[in-house]
Structures are given as structure tokens and as C-alpha cells.
């Protein structure tokens, strides 16, 4: 990169660095975006860069493919209802093992001492009840997010890395959809921005054609996209969570391609951003 290009890059980024300094960013890192170790390391390095620039970063992660692999090893089939994993008692044990154990600790290790691994059960962080609007087994609906642990870690410039296993008032563990958990955590923290890093470039009119990316969606358009089938399956909890977050005070919410190197830095610090931005009319 030439010196002139470098200068222009920093010139473009400067107002965004000022904008987000001291603000809270909640990132949901989807399991489908964790395509290889090299890319995961690059993403974690970008998160460290954000903290060095004064952004308060909270990482909420999924781990669907790793859970699917473990279920396959024990001879269990993965089943989904409206984008949510059916979770019987045996599956719940596997979810805990994979999310709070394997995936969480792998990400913390890549942060090289700047991350602290947490589970939603720690410190009564994610309190929930059994989701009752469908037969999903041990899938939880969040009742309350306690941010005490998160606040302490952010104050000391650590990155909380949160596995989305919550519990009810009796200590029974529940599988929580990571998109839903990220949105609720963003709301509870009064976050400036919620970013979902996934394995697609954003919301597509045609899921098989990346050129049909929808760069911006106003909240009133969401129901129409649902009716058209543009928002369906795993996109439902993702976008419903983002819409709820915006309605409850989170300023910005965006879906970006977590497989693209440095996509989170591009989204945060460039004029063109990345992916699909969700917004509320009058709140831009």
C-alpha cells in the first residue's frame, strides 16, 4: 500500500474511531463463520484491535457445526424448528460440552490473554424459562440478562466471550439461540452496535445469488420480507433479535460476512461498511 493510500485510509477511519471510542459493541460470531483456524485468528486479532482503539467489545458465539459434528458422532440427528435447534436432555449435555467447553475455550485462547470465557449460567448472567410456543425441549426464552460480570470485565479492558447456555430459577440449563442472546445482551448493555458475523454476505433476495444483497432494511420492511420468504429459517431469530434490539435502544445492527477477512473492521471504520444494515426510520 502506498503512503498516500495509507493516509487516506486513516483519514476515512478517524471519525469512526472517534464515534465508537468508549462505546459498547456486541458481536455475535456464528459457528458457520468459523471456517478455519487462520480466519478465526484473524477475527480475534481484529477484536483486539478494536479494544486497543477504545471500543468495549463483547463476543457472543454460536457453534452449530461443532454441535452437529458431536451429535453425529453419538448417532443423533440434528433437528430444527423455525431456525431453532430441538434440544432433548442428551442434546443439552452435548450443547454445554461443545459451546461452553470446546468452542468457548478455543476462542479465548486465540485472544491471547485479552478474553475471558463465560457461560450464560455464570453469575446468573442469562436467566430464562422453557420456550413454550413450540416443542423444542430444553430451549430457553430469556427473561433477564444480568450484566454485572460483563461490566466488570469491560471496565478492565477484557473481552467477555460468552457461550449461550442459560438457566432457569432452579438451575436447569437451557440452550439459548446465540442471535437472540446477543440481541438481549446488547439491549441490557445499552450497546451502540450489534454485529452478526455469519457465513453469508448479508440478507439476500435470492439466497443463491450474492449480487441480490439488500444493503439496508428499515424495520417496517421486515414483515414484507418474511411474507416473501426472503427472511426464513435461521434468518428469523437473527433478524427478529436485531429488530428488537433497535426498538429497545441499540443504535445500529448489521449482518456481515464473517468469512471475509477484516469484515468487522471494514464495517466499523469505513464509509461503505459491509453487509446489511437494519435501522429504524428517524434513528439514523
Q: Where are the predicted features?
A:
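Nucleotide/pyrophosphate-binding catalytic subdomain
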Residues: 1-259, 266, 272, 279-284
Amino acid at each position: 500500500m502506498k503512503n498516500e493510500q495509507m493516509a487516506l485510509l486513516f483519514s476515512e477511519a478517524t471519525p469512526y474511531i472517534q464515534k465508537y471510542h468508549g462505546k459498547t459493541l456486541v458481536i455475535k460470531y456464528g459457528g458457520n463463520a468459523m471456517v478455519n483456524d487462520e480466519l478465526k485468528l484473524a477475527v480475534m486479532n481484529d477484536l483486539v484491535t478494536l479494544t486497543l482503539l477504545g471500543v468495549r467489545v463483547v463476543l457472543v458465539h454460536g457453534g452449530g457445526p461443532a454441535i452437529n459434528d458431536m451429535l453425529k458422532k453419538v448417532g443423533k440427528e440434528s433437528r430444527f424448528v423455525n431456525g431453532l435447534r430441538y434440544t432433548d436432555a442428551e442434546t443439552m449435555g452435548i450443547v454445554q460440552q461443545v459451546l461452553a467447553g470446546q468452542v468457548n475455550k478455543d476462542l479465548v485462547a486465540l485472544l491471547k490473554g485479552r478474553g475471558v470465557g463465560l457461560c450464560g449460567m455464570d453469575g446468573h448472567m442469562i436467566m430464562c424459562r422453557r420456550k413454550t410456543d413450540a416443542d423444542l425441549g430444553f430451549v430457553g426464552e430469556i427473561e433477564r440478562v444480568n450484566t454485572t460480570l460483563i461490566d466488570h470485565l469491560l471496565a478492565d479492558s477484557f473481552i467477555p466471550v460468552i457461550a449461550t447456555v442459560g438457566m432457569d430459577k432452579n438451575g436447569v440449563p437451557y440452550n439459548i439461540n446465540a442471535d437472540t442472546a446477543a440481541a438481549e445482551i446488547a439491549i441490557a448493555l445499552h450497546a451502540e452496535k450489534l454485529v452478526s458475523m455469519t457465513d453469508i454476505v448479508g440478507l439476500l433476495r435470492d439466497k443463491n445469488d450474492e449480487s441480490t444483497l439488500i444493503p439496508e432494511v428499515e424495520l417496517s420492511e421486515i414483515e414484507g420480507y418474511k411474507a416473501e420468504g426472503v427472511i426464513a429459517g435461521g434468518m428469523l431469530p437473527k433478524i427478529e433479535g436485531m429488530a428488537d434490539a433497535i426498538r429497545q435502544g441499540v443504535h445500529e445492527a448489521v449482518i456481515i460476512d464473517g468469512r471475509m477477512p477484516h469484515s468487522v473492521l471494514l464495517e466499523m471504520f469505513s464509509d461503505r461498511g459491509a453487509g446489511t444494515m437494519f435501522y429504524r426510520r428517524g434513528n439514523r
